[in-house]
Amino acid sequence: MAFSPTGELWEVEHGPRGGDELNLIEKGKNYGWPLVSFGNNYNGVPIPKPDMRPDLAAPVIYWVPVIAPGNLMFYTGNKTFPQWNGNGFISGMGTTSLNRFIFDGHGGAKAAERWNVGKRIRDVEEGPDGSLWMLEDANPGALIHVTPK
């Protein structure tokens, strides 16, 4: 979970087999798990799709196949990568990628870029200087420092 620069609370959900989600969290809403999902149970049994339950909140974005998200963070730097100020980043373990998203401040989001890192990325954080730090999910793992070229 992470708060956007505009104060919205967002969360990423590592779903079942398929159906990872990005949700805008709002008071009183039910986001469906385990009642609905865009994925299936690991044993192959289907889970009802969200459109079958209009009383439950649908995700803003969902992934099939999965990205296996590790975490979500919002970039607030204005020196190292000023063009990303206010953007969200989601680490991808299943896609071995770093994923950038643009949030509109009104409950909407869209995918902007996906960079294949070739490693399962568990976590991404902004450093004090505005660079990015990624944590590889491996044994042994590694810290990957992202700076401009």
Residue ranges and their predicted role:
Residues 1-110, 141-142, 146-149:
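Beta-propeller domain segments
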Residues 107-128:
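Conserved blade-ending motifs and adjacent loop-strand segments that build the rim/top face
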Residues 123-149:
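Blade-level signature of beta-propeller repeat domains, shared across WD40, Kelch, NHL, RCC1
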